[in-house]
From Swiss-Prot:
Sequence ranges assigned to domain Hcy-binding in this UniProt record: 1-280
UniProt-listed PROSITE patterns: HCY (PS50970)
Region (Homocysteine S-methyltransferase), start-end ranges: 1-280
Entry keyword annotation includes Transferase: yes
Catalyzed reactions: S-methyl-L-methionine + L-homocysteine = 2 L-methionine + H(+); (6S)-5-methyl-5,6,7,8-tetrahydrofolate + NADP(+) = (6R)-5,10-methylene-5,6,7,8-tetrahydrofolate + NADPH + H(+); (6S)-5-methyl-5,6,7,8-tetrahydrofolate + NAD(+) = (6R)-5,10-methylene-5,6,7,8-tetrahydrofolate + NADH + H(+)
Keywords, ordered alphabetically: Amino-acid biosynthesis, FAD, Flavoprotein, Metal-binding, Methionine biosynthesis, Methyltransferase, NAD, NADP, Oxidoreductase, S-adenosyl-L-methionine, Transferase, Zinc
A biological-process GO annotation: methylation
Binding residues for Zn(2+): 200, 265-266
Molecular functions per Gene Ontology: metal ion binding; methionine synthase activity; methylenetetrahydrofolate reductase (NADH) activity; methylenetetrahydrofolate reductase (NADPH) activity; S-methylmethionine-homocysteine S-methyltransferase activity
Family: In the C-terminal section; belongs to the methylenetetrahydrofolate reductase family.
EC number: 2.1.1.10, 1.5.1.20
Protein name (database record): Bifunctional homocysteine S-methyltransferase/5,10-methylenetetrahydrofolate reductase
Induction: Induced by methionine starvation.
Amino acid sequence: MGLLEDLQRQVLIGDGAMGTLLYSYGIDRCFEELNISKPEEIQRIHKAYVEAGANIIQTNTYGANYIKLSRHGLEDDIKKMNQEAVKIARASAGDAYVLGTMGGIRTFNKNAYSLDEIKRSFREQLYLLLHEEPDGLLLETYYDLEEAREVLKIARKETDLPIMLNVSMHEQGVLQDGTPLSDALRSIADLGADIVGINCRLGPYHMIEALSEVPIFDDVFLSVYPNSSLPSLEEGRLVYETDDTYFQNSASEFRKQGARIIGGCCGTTPNHIRAMAEAVGGLAPITEKEVKTRAKEFISVHHERTEPGLDEIAAKKRSIIVELDPPKKLSFDKFLSAAAELKEAGIDALTLADNSLATPRISNVACGALVKQQLDMRSLVHITCRDRNIIGLQSHLMGLDTLGLNDVLAITGDPSKIGDFPGATSVYDLTSFDLIRLIKQFNEGLSLSGKPLGKKTNFSVAAAFNPNVRHLDKAVKRLEKKIDCGADYFVSQPVYSEQQLVDIHNETKHLKTPIYIGIMPLTSSRNAEFIHNEIPGIKLSDTIREKMAHAGEDKEKQKAEGLAIARSLLDTACELFNGIYLITPFLRSDLTAELTSYIQQKDEQRQNIFLH
């Protein structure tokens, strides 16, 4: 009798965690490598689960794929690890079924690996496992539904063996993209999975609640592998705590929800499996139940903007935004005075960097809130991935929405090692691509875990563009990728060459997404030499450097020459781009205010010529 035939007549018990037990033995390295170096340890765990009552065990191959093994420098051992894993499981299984296990790759950082890379890695491991002839496949811990669907298509095409696919939830009842669990399971069932279910992250209580909203499907079986509990940290080690009796009672509840396979994930041990086997092992499955209707959480629609987005302005006419760095010291008067000068000059928005060059400054959110409150100015608030983890970024976005600061620029952020505190941690939980997606998901009223936020935000998302690279075409490809992620417009690094401006226009003119081209006035010869020699990718022409050097130490001459160079660049930029991004050096708002006036005068002259 095969696995699927067995499931027709009884509830089967899966095994529990492998990593938890190895970790408890003091092993804290690549667990899959133990298939080669310490096979007796893996066999001991398999046997313990079989003796506890498991009808199904899974091979120790969750991370035995190219992507995960390469993190340990073990990618050359992938074949032997998978081969040995199936042999060890077979030798331990007795009458239990052996499933070849393959784990998900994607987490929140969807851009860490492309879908093509994931599929190549999956396909290689799949062939290795199938060659060893397991009784079926277990694809588990898939947080990303797109990834789950794609790898399932590959597996279903290559084998007729039973396939179990378990997705994982950060929040009860929904996947991280907001897809209800019931819909997600139905979609993978339609792609050919024989058993669909959930594992990891959540304990029994939340999984029971989640399954109460899932019907008992006629064409596939249901599986559940809960964590034992939420983990706690004791003396630097993760510890899970759950009473075996609790798991015994939970197993009965899982059966009532229609589960045919009940096992355990992180934190579970043979004791948990024994408790569940005693409770429901071998019992007839439940075939009918009352499905709880998922409560629809009210998500209020965001208020419509009373002003057009910066992308909308730049798509139709001239738009000028000006960067003004928040102060490094606890003195706000000079900053506020500079902001007022720029408002008087008629800019569309003030852009506020997020601890630029990894240097601590007054919070740009505080600056944005104050200039809005005191000057009624619009702010484009930069958000870096460097300083905040996933929790902090979401809290940050919620705060911005609460303050009504709806214009944001999503950037990676300069690494901490270049700033005042080179030993500080650079977080980078997300890339700028992921951050753009996250902000757009907030606009749909969903957090990163898929949990409803109660309202939709109304963020307009800018993305960074660095044209100061050797291969401009590759930089443009990154722009296209950011557009796919949801970027509404771009803000560029400063440009110091008329020809470069022309090249940028030619390479980007096919894009419908507006670009604000960056222009930053030089303040001295020393400033010019610093930019030329120390800022990656930016090279000033000999002519520009000579002009700034010729100005000497005379501050008025330095200012005049710096403005003259900027005006020359603006003459070209304004012909090619509607959006102009002026970067204020050293809080010298007089420079960017004067350049703003210059742009406005040029536009007025052009308009007069057009009218006449």
